[in-house]
């Protein structure tokens, strides 16, 4: 069992004085997370992302840093993981010397999409948040293992003879 380093309860901890708060990665949901932080009195200092092209412009009025460069600018920081793959972010940031991670699930529990004008349509944002929430909820569910995708490779000739089969070795 992998140790869970990400905390579910975040609002009070992030409101308290401490290291800067940074939102990790820039999926469309990051905009909703930034809005929810403002609604809850949490000051976000910046965003970070692994794609250098995203760090060349502002997002939601805040600077975006290339993740590997964070330690130069922020020796200590608290991170809100906006990415669907929480563990991947935690591993990368832990390797950079960080140890304070939060899921924004608590922030988005009562988030009202219709209250804001997003960069994408309201219905699409609502759907994105719904799917995103499921991946974060599964991270905290001890009874389940979350796999975002699963590749199946058939290595022998299939004998099912399905009518609409796309397998190259069908029959």
Regions from the language model: what does each represent?
Residues 20, 76, 141, 149-152:
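A general structural-boundary detector
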